[in-house]
């Protein structure tokens, strides 16, 4: 089981299937740092941020997008929301900007729609 993105060439987390933990997408791969942007990363959902040699240097000919993609201390903002337990198991909970903009300008979050449908 793994987790990654193109900007991280491509792996962020991985765990062999024999060590799989329900709901987790693995532990951070060697040579990469990960943090959860929250006050309590094991219980409180926050944006996953990564830093390491396999992380891109920036977007080609797009310095503004590059500036927006990184924190002041050089961590890449993944846009993924998640937690990390004390053993380093990463759990993805959603996307930071996962929303649908309706014709009247209202923000609709797919997770809220899914929860309402599941409750029926």
Task: Please identify what each model-predicted range represents.
Residues 33-35, 81:
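Short, surface-exposed charged micro-motifs
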């Amino acid at each position: 089981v793994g987790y990654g993105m193109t900007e991280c060439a491509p792996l962020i987390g991985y765990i062999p299937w024999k060590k799989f933990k329900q709901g987790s997408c693995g532990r951070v791969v060697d040579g990469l740092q990960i943090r959860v942007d929250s006050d309590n990363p094991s219980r409180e959902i926050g944006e996953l941020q990564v830093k390491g040699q396999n992380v891109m240097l920036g977007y080609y000919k797009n310095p503004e997008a590059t500036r927006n993609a990184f924190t002041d201390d050089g961590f890449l903002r993944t846009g993924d929301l998640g937690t990390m337990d004390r053993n380093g198991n990463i759990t993805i909970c959603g996307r930071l900007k996962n929303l649908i903009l309706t014709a009247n300008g209202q923000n609709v979050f797919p997770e809220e729609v899914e929860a309402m449908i599941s409750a029926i």
